[in-house]
């Protein structure tokens, strides 16, 4: 190898070291920085995925508590579990990406900068030393030849000249070998770094392949079953069909008081002696469809093509899933319609009116007062009513107008449609007043005199004037109510305050108003308006007049 070839290789060796230090290492640092950003983004994806599948699990819990969608809840649980396993595999890939690639590359690049600087310096020093030794031998040989040319005896320097030539040849060989080895070492160092990067990237790719393979295996195994589970939305589970058939064969039951599960999705106990109510006119055209179709959603006891009006996704809060109704005849449909009534509590003995906070007073089965046979009667809410979690009840505010949809109240409950919210359901009839044909409201009264209204309506007589609360102690025991100021909350629902006054009256208050025979005369004094403006005598006189009237 000529000297010029050795110098060329020396320059190539230096360029390899400089390329590693000035280009490879900075690029590797940038690669590590981008890898950290990628890791951070994937960590954010895993965090979001955990929240996503936690929400999916909750949806599965809701579905599993439904009689009609229990198997879909199991499917949602399986989906969440499968994706949890896939997510665990992704986390393993992230750990490998961080530990086997980013961390080790970051450590290598910091150590490598110092190592390469030292290696290049060592190579340059050794190469310079060998080059200087060669140059020195060549200079000595040149001097020796000049001296032999001027000497009278040239043979005297021939042996020494041969020694210098051999030394120069050895020095030059050593230099060339060192430069060649240095170039090889530089290329090896460069290749070692790229191989390390590829090796670590292969480890990450291996984990990535395991992640995708695991996901493909799990999804390919479960996906057909999941698709089969949701292929027919109208298909009712066999257990729900059997339950509906059992309900239809055992008589009327009420889907009220749904409290057996978190979402209250159970069918309530049957009402003792409940009788089916007539089917509302708007249900008549759809009775045939109930028999023809496999299943039809029932909401608030109403079914038909206007089901969108009662969709829980349309204009109210989402209701819990309900099981669908099996095919029924017209009589069974009427039974199921009447069974949307709220569950009636057990009735106390007739000779006892004592109640507690968790009991309701017996509800009557009186007719709706003033209900027209040829038209729809309207009532006005005088109290607010909240349905709560029971989808069969109707919520309304004080002053709302309600159109009655059935001709007869059932145990103090009536079925109607709110003109404000367009929702339908059962509501306590004593919370409302019947509107006359001219739009004015009046208190409703029983059309069947042999039956009693709910205890909150015992005073609802148009020809009865109730004295103010201060007309004697006997009248204070019974709540004062008038036709124009009926603001006392009716007692068709559990209100324990009324039970204290009922013990004083016994069974006779059950059939008639105990104050119906009292005829009051108007007082001649007006001292109740402002007692503070009168003297002690005036107040005493006023109190005496009140006592006189009360005594009568």
Swiss-Prot record:
Signal peptide: none
Cited SUPFAM superfamilies: BAR/IMD domain-like, SH3-domain
Outcome of mutating residue 147 to E: Abolishes actin-bundling and filopodia formation
Keyword annotations of the record: Cell projection, Coiled coil, Cytoplasm, Cytoskeleton, Membrane, Phosphoprotein, SH3 domain
A Gene Ontology BP annotation from the UniProt entry: dendrite development
PTM (free text): Phosphorylated on tyrosine residues by INSR in response to insulin treatment.
Coiled-coil ranges (or none): 132-153
InterPro entries: AH/BAR_dom_sf, BAIP2_I-BAR_dom, BAIP2_SH3, I-BAR_dom, IRSp53/IRTKS/Pinkbar, SH3-like_dom_sf, SH3_domain
GO-annotated molecular function: cadherin binding involved in cell-cell adhesion; cytoskeletal anchor activity; identical protein binding; PDZ domain binding; proline-rich region binding; scaffold protein binding; transcription coregulator binding
Domain IMD: 1-250
Skewed-composition ranges (Polar residues): 348-367, 447-457
Composition bias, Low complexity: 320-334
Positions of the SH3 domain: 374-437
Stated consequence of mutating residue 428 to A: Loss of interaction with ENAH and no induction of filopodia
Record flagged with keyword Cell division: no
A Pfam family: IMD
Stretches the record annotates as Disordered: 295-369, 447-466, 525-552
Modified residues (Phosphothreonine): 296, 340, 360
Localization per Swiss-Prot or TrEMBL: Cytoplasm; Membrane; Cell projection, Filopodium; Cell projection, Ruffle
Consequence of changing residue 142 to E: Abolishes actin-bundling and filopodia formation
Expressed in which tissues: Isoform 1 and isoform 4 are expressed almost exclusively in brain. Isoform 4 is barely detectable in placenta, prostate and testis. A short isoform is ubiquitous, with the highest expression in liver, prostate, testis and placenta.
SMART domains with a match to the protein in the record: SH3 (SM00326)
PANTHER family for this protein: BRAIN-SPECIFIC ANGIOGENESIS INHIBITOR 1-ASSOCIATED PROTEIN 2
Record note on domains: The IMD domain forms a coiled coil. The isolated domain can induce actin bundling and filopodia formation. In the absence of G-proteins intramolecular interaction between the IMD and the SH3 domain gives rise to an auto-inhibited state of the protein. Interaction of the IMD with RAC1 or CDC42 leads to activation.
Protein name, as recorded: BAR/IMD domain-containing adapter protein 2
């Amino acid at each position: 190898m000529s000297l010029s070839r050795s110098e060329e290789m020396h320059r190539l060796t230096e360029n390899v070291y400089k390329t590693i230090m000035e280009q490879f290492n900075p690029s590797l640092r940038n690669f590590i920085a981008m890898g950290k950003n990628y890791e951070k983004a994937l960590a954010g994806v895993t965090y979001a995925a955990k929240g996503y599948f936690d929400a999916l699990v909750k949806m599965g819990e809701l579905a599993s508590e439904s009689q009609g969608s229990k198997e879909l809840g199991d499917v949602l649980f399986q989906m969440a579990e499968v994706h949890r396993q896939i997510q665990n595999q992704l986390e393993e890939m992230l750990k490998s990406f961080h530990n086997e690639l980013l961390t080790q590359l970051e450590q290598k690049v910091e150590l490598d900068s110092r190592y390469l600087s030292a290696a290049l310096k060592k190579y340059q020093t050794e190469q310079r030393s060998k080059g200087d030794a060669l140059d020195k031998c060549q200079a000595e040989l040149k001097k020796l030849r000049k001296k032999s040319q001027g000497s009278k005896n040239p043979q005297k320097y021939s042996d020494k000249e041969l020694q210098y030539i051999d030394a120069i040849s050895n020095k030059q060989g050593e230099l060339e070998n060192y430069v060649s080895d240095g170039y090889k070492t530089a290329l090896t160092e460069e290749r070692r770094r790229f191989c390390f990067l590829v090796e670590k990237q292969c480890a990450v790719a291996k984990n990535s392949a395991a992640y995708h393979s695991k996901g493909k295996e799990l999804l390919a195994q479960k996906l057909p079953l999941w698709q089969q589970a949701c292929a027919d939305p109208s298909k009712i589970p066999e257990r729900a069909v059997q339950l509906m058939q059992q309900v239809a064969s055992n008589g009327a039951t009420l889907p009220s008081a749904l409290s057996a599960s978190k979402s209250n999705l159970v069918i309530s106990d049957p009402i003792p002696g409940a009788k089916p109510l007539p089917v509302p006119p708007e249900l008549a055209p759809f009775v045939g469809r109930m028999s023809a179709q496999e299943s039809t959603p029932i909401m608030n006891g109403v079914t038909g093509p206007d089901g969108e009006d009662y969709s829980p996704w349309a204009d109210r809060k989402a209701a819990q899933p309900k099981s669908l109704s099996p095919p029924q005849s017209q009589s069974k449909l009427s039974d199921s319609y009447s069974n949307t009534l709220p569950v009636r509590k057990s009735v106390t003995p007739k000779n006892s009116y004592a109640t507690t906070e968790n009991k309701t007073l017996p509800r009557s089965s009186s007719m709706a007062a003033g209900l027209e046979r040829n038209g729809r009667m309207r009532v006005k809410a005088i109290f607010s009513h909240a349905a709560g979690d029971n989808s069969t009840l109707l919520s309304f505010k004080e002053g709302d107008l309600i159109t009655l949809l059935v001709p007869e109240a059932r145990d103090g409950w009536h079925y109607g449609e709110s003109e404000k919210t367009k929702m339908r359901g059962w509501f306590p009839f004593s919370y409302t007043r019947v509107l006359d044909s001219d739009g004015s409201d009046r208190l409703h009264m029983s059309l069947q005199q042999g039956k009693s209204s709910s205890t909150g309506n015992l005073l609802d007589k148009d020809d009865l004037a109730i004295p103010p609360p201060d007309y004697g102690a006997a009248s204070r025991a019974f709540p004062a109510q008038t036709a124009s100021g009926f603001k006392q909350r009716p007692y068709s629902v559990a209100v324990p305050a009324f039970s204290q006054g009922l013990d004083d009256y016994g069974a006779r208050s059950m059939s008639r108003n105990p104050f119906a025979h009292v005829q009051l005369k108007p007082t001649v004094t007006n001292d109740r308006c402002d007692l503070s403006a009168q003297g002690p005598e005036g107040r005493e006189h006023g109190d005496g007049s009140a006592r006189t009237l009360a005594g009568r």
